[in-house]
């Protein structure tokens, strides 16, 4: 389990772009984290003012940040900078709205040098909001 202060020790992201609020579970190859989505998120001002929906690209970014926590937790990557290197087979199945708690689960399926590949799923209330494959580069 990690709180926001521990997350900030690992990730270089900061408000308004830090999209992980807590980590519930972390192992060498898997992370389960959460983003509490509130109406106060800056992106809701324009996406969309009369019907606020979390942008899909930010759901994917939240998944990438969660996956980066798993990688940066490894001794050889501590203190390094994570870069989002690619996405594949991403599908959006449910809108994420203010008040939702986004559960972010990333399983690292392959690690080759400083390049990692993960299977990522974001859910709200047990229903898939987004899933796909993500690629990381650690610099």
UniProtKB/Swiss-Prot annotation:
InterPro entries: FabA_FabZ (IPR013114), FabZ (IPR010084), HotDog_dom_sf (IPR029069). Belongs to the thioester dehydratase family. FabZ subfamily. One of its GO terms (cellular component) is cytoplasm. Its main location: cytoplasm. It is an enzyme of class 4 (lyase). NCBIfam families: fabZ, PRK00006.1. The gene is fabZ. PANTHER family: 3-HYDROXYACYL-[ACYL-CARRIER-PROTEIN] DEHYDRATASE (PTHR30272:SF1). It comes from the Bacteria. Its EC number is 4.2.1.59. GO terms for biological process: fatty acid biosynthetic process; lipid A biosynthetic process. It is found in: Cytoplasm. It comes from Clostridium perfringens (strain SM101 / Type A). The active site is at residue 47. Gene3D superfamilies: Hotdog Thioesterase. The keyword Zinc does not apply. Disulfide bonds: none annotated. It catalyses: a (3R)-hydroxyacyl-[ACP] = a (2E)-enoyl-[ACP] + H2O. Keywords: Cytoplasm, Lipid A biosynthesis, Lipid biosynthesis, Lipid metabolism, Lyase. GO terms for molecular function: (3R)-hydroxyacyl-[acyl-carrier-protein] dehydratase activity. Coiled coil: none annotated. This is 3-hydroxyacyl-[acyl-carrier-protein] dehydratase FabZ. Involved in unsaturated fatty acids biosynthesis. Catalyzes the dehydration of short chain beta-hydroxyacyl-ACPs and long chain saturated and unsaturated beta-hydroxyacyl-ACPs.
């Amino acid at each position: 389990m990690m709180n926001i202060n521990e997350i900030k020790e690992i990730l270089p992201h900061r408000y308004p772009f830090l999209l992980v609020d807590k980590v519930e579970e972390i192992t060498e190859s898997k992370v389960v984290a959460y983003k509490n989505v509130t109406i106060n998120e800056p992106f809701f001002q324009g996406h969309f003012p009369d019907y606020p929906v979390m942008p899909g690209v930010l759901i994917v970014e939240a998944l990438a940040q969660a996956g980066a926590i798993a990688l940066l937790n490894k001794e050889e990557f501590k203190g390094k900078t994570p870069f989002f290197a690619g996405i594949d087979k991403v599908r959006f199945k449910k809108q994420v709205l203010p008040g939702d708690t986004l559960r972010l689960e990333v399983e690292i399926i392959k690690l080759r040098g400083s390049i990692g590949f993960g299977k990522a799923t974001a859910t709200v209330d047990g229903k898939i909001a987004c899933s796909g494959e993500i690629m990381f580069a650690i610099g």
